[in-house]
């Protein structure tokens, strides 16, 4: 059986990295992918999907340097998990657990807002 996903998209925000109690770094970032299709009237429509990406260890440390808006290649596996939120409601979450992340487009931090 195969559980493999490949995505190319734009970072929705700067990656957030933290260190677990055992010293293992773990990072998270959102990734936007887009798709275009023709509707029944023949007009092009764009859709955007948002993906939660999780990175571990050295990969988490490398991804800390990435910034919002950069184009990246992600390869990994789909992982589904459940958790209970602060209101006691059980939630289902789908993550992409990445084993490869490559920067495809370098974009520098800007001092201008917007």
Task: Map each language-model feature to its residues.
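Acidic, gly/ser/pro-rich intrinsically disordered tails
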Residues: 1-3, 15-24, 38-44, 61-64, ...
